[in-house]
Amino acid sequence: MAVCQICGKKTAHGNRVAHSATTTKRTWKPNLQKVKAVLPDGTTKKIYVCAKCLKAGKVRKAVR
C-alpha cells in the first residue's frame, strides 16, 4: 500500500466493534493524492501525499 512521502502516514489496522461486542478486523486508509511536486533538489516528480500535508502547505506543487 502507498505511504505519504512527507509524513509517513499509512494504513492503520484495528477492530470493527458491534453492539454485541463481536469484533472483526478493519482498516483505515489515509486520503492519499498523487501530486506532481518540486523536490528540494529542484526536480519534479509524482509522489503520494496525504490531504493533511497538502492542506498544511508542506508540498510545493509543480507549475504546469
From Swiss-Prot:
Q: Which InterPro entries match?
A: Bacterial_rp_bL28, Ribosomal_bL28, Ribosomal_bL28/bL31-like_sf, Ribosomal_bL28_bact-type, Ribosomal_bL28_sf
- Give the source's domain of life in one word: Bacteria
Ribonucleoprotein in keyword set: yes
Q: Which GO terms describe its cellular component?
A: ribonucleoprotein complex; ribosome
A biological process (GO) of this protein is: translation
Alphabetical list of Gene3D superfamilies matching this protein: Ribosomal protein L28/L24
Q: Which HAMAP family does the record cross-reference, listed alphabetically?
A: Ribosomal_bL28
User: Into which family does the record put it?
Assistant: Belongs to the bacterial ribosomal protein bL28 family.
Q: What is the name of the protein in this document?
A: Large ribosomal subunit protein bL28
The organism named in the record is: Persephonella marina (strain DSM 14350 / EX-H1)
